[in-house]
Amino acid sequence: MKHPLKALVPLLAVAVLTAACNPFTPRNTPTAAPTQYPQDPRFAEFVYKSDETPTVKDRTDSINIRWPNAKASEAHVVVEYSPALAFIPAQDPEFWLTAVATIPDETIQLLAEGEATDTLLPGIYPHLYEYVPQECKFTTIDPEFADKALAPDKEKIPHDFDPMDIQALAVSKDCHLLVFTALGHS
């Protein structure tokens, strides 16, 4: 009876060590499975990745300099570089931005013309969800229209704020909020 127990102990030890070293187990990193983030059914999936842990910053300049017609009075922004693709040399580094900004009536009226079919809110960095009240009603705006309306002359953007293209945008008239994602290359 002692022999089966002696054989079982080493097998259990191997099983425990193997499970601890499983490379397919999600880790708490920015590139891990999206289940690590808060969930909110109002938003599209957050698809951007970074080698760094994204940080939410309060920066109106990041919005108002790149998109001068936004005229944001408050902005919660995440800007990060996408993971580098080592096999593609001489590629300009890609970076992404997700934001929630407070905007005036003037900006809302400017964007109203670009109303598109309503869909989910843009897939912003999930730690920005807290800045989007549940009671806000949103209208989806065509990204190309929004880009041209908010930044009519991208050549005038200072070089230390690389221009970006809006990927998805929604505006709330009742809450004076702009929720959007953008991509750029530096």
Would you name each region that the model predicts?
Residues R27-N28, D142:
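Secreted/processed peptides and extracellular or luminal domains of membrane proteins
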Residues N22-T25:
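Bacterial signal peptide processing site
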Residues L17-A20:
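C-terminal motif of bacterial Sec signal peptides marking the signal peptidase cleavage site
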Residues P68-F145:
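Mature extracytoplasmic domains of secretory-pathway proteins
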Residues M1-V9:
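Bacterial N-terminal signal peptides that target proteins for export
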Residues T29-P89:
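Extracytoplasmic low-complexity, Pro/Thr/Ser/Ala/Gly-rich segments
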Residues L121-S186:
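Extracytoplasmic electrostatic interaction patches
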